[in-house]
């Protein structure tokens, strides 16, 4: 509440349509907010396109042919697994509830390590303590077992198992304090609209939920007109829209937002080498913002898309825990 109040008082962020009671998870950037946002965008754009001869920019349209979203799997599978608490009537992402439970286990380990370090002082061997302390080993074993079960449920798209994990871990609703959960259901996140002059002849189109597809469909256009040779990248900054059912945490999770995205195209067999290099490059960029190196960490995905060999998020420690800022 302090951050939200400060952001409004000093002209950074306003609730959109505030004079008409606002619109959930939709915000306007004020006179200072827009300057700050533009500075970050400019810094990112220059780091991507001006410092790399083999990365160029585009600005693709928000509307795209609906077949693109069908082919990419978004129409059928761009979903969040949601669960309701019957007592509080609040809705949550089932996967996030479990991820938060895993994070609590990690925190328990770190607290045990911190206590031991304080007790033993300079003679403390952290690596040995983590490997031999019975309490730490017990927590790690439980965490690893839960992580394995959770990852399998995600990969199998097993909604019943996600709910069972929540029940077995005795996860409670933070509002009501109860464990009275509904079944887990999938909700598609894409906004639909109609394009055409008449209702009968209109085509169903979507507000893009991400900027990547605009890059992919323009790959050949950019490659041919720019005479680009692999490896090369295409970057863009643009609006994206997601019908977030669970929209909380201020501007961290909004229904209309901007993405800064770069897709880097490499030769088959070289993807993991480039993946490792870009991980470190992007982490250095974030740390250069001066917000504190200890505030960042990598988080490997538990569930990979069918086309991916690896996926990692860069997370930042928000007031409400570590959350993804880049992936």
Predicted ranges, named:
Residues 1-327:
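TRNA-recognition modules of translation machinery and tRNA-sensing kinases, especially anticodon-binding
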């Amino acid at each position: 509440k302090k951050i939200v109040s400060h952001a409004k008082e000093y002209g950074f962020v306003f609730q959109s349509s505030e004079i008409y009671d606002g619109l959930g998870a939709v915000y306007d950037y004020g006179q200072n907010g827009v300057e700050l946002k533009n500075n970050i965008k400019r810094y990112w754009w220059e780091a991507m396109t001006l410092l790399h001869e083999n990365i160029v920019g585009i600005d693709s349209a928000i509307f795209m042919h609906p077949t693109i979203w069908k082919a990419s799997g978004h129409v059928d599978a761009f979903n969040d697994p949601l669960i309701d608490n019957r007592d509080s009537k609040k809705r949550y992402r089932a996967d996030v509830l479990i991820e938060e439970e895993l994070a609590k286990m990690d925190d328990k380990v770190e607290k045990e390590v911190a206590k031991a370090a304080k007790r033993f002082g300079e003679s403390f061997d952290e690596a040995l303590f983590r490997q031999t302390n019975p309490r730490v080993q017990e927590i790690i074993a439980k965490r690893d077992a839960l992580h394995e079960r959770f990852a399998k449920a995600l990969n199998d798209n097993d909604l019943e198992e996600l709910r069972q994990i929540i029940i077995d871990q005795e996860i409670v609703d933070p509002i009501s304090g109860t464990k009275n959960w509904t079944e887990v259901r999938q909700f598609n996140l894409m906004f639909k609209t109609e394009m055409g002059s008449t209702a009968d002849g209109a085509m169903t189109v979507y507000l893009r939920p991400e900027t990547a597809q605009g890059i992919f469909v323009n790959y050949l256009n950019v490659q041919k007109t720019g005479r680009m040779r692999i490896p090369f990248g295409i970057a863009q900054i643009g609006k994206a829209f997601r019908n977030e059912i669970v929209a909380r945490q201020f501007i961290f999770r909004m229904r209309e937002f901007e993405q800064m995205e770069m897709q880097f195209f490499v030769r088959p067999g070289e993807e993991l080498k480039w993946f490792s290099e870009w991980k470190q490059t992007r982490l250095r960029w974030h740390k250069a913002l001066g917000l504190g190196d200890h505030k960042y960490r990598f988080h490997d995905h538990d569930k990979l898309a069918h086309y991916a060999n690896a996926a990692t998020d860069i997370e930042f420690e928000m007031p409400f825990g570590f959350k993804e800022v880049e992936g």
